[in-house]
Amino acid sequence: MAGIAATPWGTDHAWMDLVTVPPRPATLVEALKESRRALEPPPPDPSGARDGSRLDALRRSLRSHKVTGMVVPRADAHQGEFVASNAERLAWLTGFTGSAGVAVVTPRCAALFVDGRYTLQAAEQVNTGLWDIVPLAHTSVNDWLAKTLARGDKLGYDPWLHTVSEVDRRNRVCEKAGAQCVPLPVNPIDTLWQNRPPPPLGPVIPHPDMLAGWSSADKRQRIARDLRDAGATAMVITDPASLAWLLNIRGADVPFTPLPLGFGILHGDGAVDLFMDGRKLPRPVLAQLGPDITLRAPSALADALDTLGGQRRRVLLDADACAQWVRDRLSRAGASVRLGADPIALPKARKTPAELEGARAAHVRDGAALVRFLCWLDQEGPRGTQTEMSAVATLHALRAEAQQFRGPSFETISGAGPNGAIVHYRVTPETDRRIEPDMLYLVDSGAQYRDGTTDVTRTVPIGTPTREQIRRFTQVLKGHIALATVTFPRGTTGSHLDTLARVALWADGVDFEHGTGHGVGSYLGVHEGPQRISRRPSSVALDPGMIVSNEPGYYKTGAFGIRIENLVAVAPVTEPPAGAEIPLLRFETLTLAPIDRRLIDVAALTVAERTWLDAYHARVLREIGPLVDDDTRAWLAQATAPLAPETADGTGPEATPPAVPSASS
């Protein structure tokens, strides 16, 4: 039960199937919930991080391991975006709770590396008298090490927490400095961390073939064929998302993403050895997996890798995702290690027709909840009675009314006024800001449903927006529409299209620093690769079925933030222009929610841009209107009305917000 208590909530009653047999009387259900609450591990006490006692203890431990320093990433053995509570080693050591960061500890200094999202948060949470906060935009971890390491230094690391490619790059840095990278047999933090939460025991559930569109047996045969074509006879699967997709299962071991933590070995005949705690798999799931899936304890992975080595097997590993520990074990055992891309990644990214249908249904459902929220916000925002946190709670409650809802797909970004300018802002009780007139409010949120994953951002004026806010919002909208309406040939990558989202902003000499689009899974990760839309070069083409986000923005530090985000699916152009000589692709917009007309300078839009927005809004009203109450439908009709000609001063289509139902309605 302690392992169950270490998993996120939001898995309905599936976890109860691991400890009791249905049907369950209401009294038993409540007793189980109380037992789980009592066993939930408390968050790490930050006092030991702030007073330096943990840092001192780690340095003493490193001396006993005969190393002079250590790299501590926010990572687990699976290299995922979200980690279980027992893997929050960076937070335990430093007090920093952001979703990405790396610490380096040496006898002389301690540095915490964070990206631009977390510079302010790190400075607030970490004792800067003990730790140097290093922005990754200025100095990479390896560049810092190259300047800091001395000849003869031994830099320790946990080989479970670093990928093969990371270790290769770091080894080169150490060799150049005359130092060594030393894999540690045990992570010292695991020994020092008192009351560390147990490994999570989230229930594994089947993901029906009707939602996946492809049976696990067919998937395994397809990937096994690709494996053989690549000259390998087996592959080690360390990414839980790849494992979940391949076996048509989902889990509940980490926040926000329905992942079952475990490892797999796929053999050339399509059989899989699954290394996962058997307590997580109810009997119906075991039966669904079938005879070609052999369930083994996680502790058996080492022996299984030794067996592959003893058989001199050719084993494929993804160098960018696989832990160095796996390569070390295979190499020592005599296996021939082949490094290459995960062959599951692209098939997983190319959604089946069934997955696309699920995504469309999920977005209609999500759109209804979001429209109800935006209507509520239009009523409550000007009153100044709501805060960023109360808005998050309201939106969550509206989504949770859907039977298929399984929880948020990430922690909601609820940014009022200047907080909206922090790209990945996370509200806390200490930062919670009141939503009130004369500010912009940015809300970036998403949900997990049994049939799809959503991610959407809307920016709303509370009161009357300024001319500057209208200009910037309109520029962001023009970039959004440019990407939404583009047609492109097969083989086009996201880096080819990224410029479209930025040109209107560039005209004024401004830009946004984040990527324009990320891939999204099917009841899996809200951030999924390998596809993306970004300035960073990419060799991965945007293929039919891929889902990506379209989210240009603008951020004025200390003032406001703007982002417009829809999810889109890559689809063939079914009616190409006359004389077209090559097959073309387009984007199908999935997200359904109004884009605030009060922030649009209609005079700055082209006829084509106005036509697109009017058509999009008509679709939102058509598909969402029947799903909401009469008052919300009336509000939605105004929020999606065709754009009126620009006003005399060119400030936008209307000066007043849509009518909002009264509090009594």
Predicted regions and their residues:
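Active-site neighborhoods and metal-handling regions in enzymes and metal-associated proteins
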Residues: 2-665
